[in-house]
Amino acid sequence: NKIDLPASEIDRTKKQIESNKIKLDSKIQLIKPLSFSDYCSLQKDSFVVLSDSGTIFEESSILNFRALNLRESHERPEAVEETTVVISGLKKERILQGIEILQNQFTGLKRNINIVNDYNVKNVSFKVERLIASYIDYVNRVVWQKEF
């Protein structure tokens, strides 16, 4: 039973692998960083996503894919309350336990985990436009120190 494990080949990771002479398992495929849309597609098409990213909570909740966060702490209590992601830390037995739990999660259009209400906002582009327009002069004056 073959499981592919694509991992983003960012410079920092590549340097760590090389400097520590780490031999990767043949199932781990280092890939060039993806565009955001390609990255989201990869996540949606995966059986489970293992990540240490802080945004995995929003992505998993909105796109409804199985996700395991490898951190031990996080800044997204609202997502943990809805159980959109299982938090495992780095211990092998906790990671395997998390993957086993995630097998029961529906994905795609069928849901058994609620989307986090804070992430299910209507009229986002309308609101962003109004916020930007409201702060243009303030940002130009305070941040960029432009005179009018």
Segments (PLM) and residue ranges:
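Nucleotide-activated sugar donor-binding and catalytic core shared by glycosyltransferases
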Residues: 1-148
